[in-house]
Amino acid sequence: NNPICVEVETKALLESLDRVSVVISEKLKSPVRCLFDADRVYLSARTGNGEAKDICPISGDGQQLEIGFNNRYLMDALRYAPADKVKMQLNTGISPCIITPVDGGDEFLYMVLPVRLKAQ
């Protein structure tokens, strides 16, 4: 039961995640902080290598939900999703994100677990 539902172009979100992930490495791991807002998601990551930020357009209202993800897990789910646009169903910053096709088909369903974020 996820009250927050947004739609996003798979390629656009993958590209945003890729740009933000440049500061993340095997030695310097950090979650990607996602702030879902109305019509956009703000992505950021901070490590000893520096800080990276990006914005990706979405359809829907993320209700200011802030959630962290391991960049690899979220990127893998999006990379293997056989759809140009996906639906992300969210609830809280500590509950899983469910990724499904926008058209309502049942070709895939990915569940990505969040990472607890430290206060900024």
List the predicted regions and their residue ranges.
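DNA polymerase processivity clamps
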Residues: N1-Q120
